[in-house]
Amino acid sequence: LSHGHYDHGNGLARFLEVNDHAQIYINRHASGQYYYRSERYIGIDPEVIRTLSESGRVVFTDDTYIIDDELSLCTCNDKTSVFPVDNAGLTEKIGDTFVPDRFLHEQYLVINDKTHISQTEKSVIGRRIVLSGCSHKGILNIVNWLRPDVLIGGFHFMDIDVSSGYSDVLNKAAEVLMTEHEGRTPTMFYTCHCTGAAQYSYLKKRMCDRLEYLSSGQTVEI
């Protein structure tokens, strides 16, 4: 589970009914009190958390969790943001006080692909593939911290206004995403969900074949 918001986690109780074996990895902060401003609760339903806890199939993770030689989960909570992050009104309730969400509950799946064959060098090379949910800590920060060869996830750009045909924020994002590889093979990006259709189209014009859109049920070969 990428983070503790209802639109990502509330379906897990139903998932347990239709799947009788898979383990679910949830960060221990995912059961926190998360809101949009102070007006609307957007965290996972406490009843779902209870069902998950009692299922015996949930692994509650901390900042880093190693699943096996290829798969690991990390929060990057110990990292310092290099690029500014807009919380977009997302908060957490601590006691009786609402504060900007620190997104301690957000985690990323890192896949260390040790079997990829380079089409140019015809040799086996390692690749790092990162899966992010909504990238609340900032897609630019995540790329800076994890240095992926492939990144799949939402960019959380859906509220950025592109109606004028120009956006400083998206221009900066495209520039950084296109150059943040420093001697490595340039990162390939697949995006979806909270990026926004108009925002994706804006980025696509600037990132060209380095950015593709994903839809539910779609299969891509990376």
Residue ranges, per PLM feature:
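Short acidic/glycine-rich loop or secondary-structure boundary segments that cap or lie
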Residues: Y34, D68, S81-P84, G138-N141, ...
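Hydrophobic/aromatic beta-strand patches that form the interior of the parallel beta-sheet core
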Residues: Y25, V59, S72-C74, I152, ...
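Cap/insert and terminal regions of metallo-dependent hydrolase folds
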Residues: L104-Y108, N112-V220
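Short amphipathic alpha-helices and their capping/turn segments at secondary-structure boundaries
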Residues: L12-E17, T64-D68, N141-L146
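Active-site HxH/HxHxD metal-binding segment of metal-dependent hydrolases
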Residues: S2-D63, N77-V85
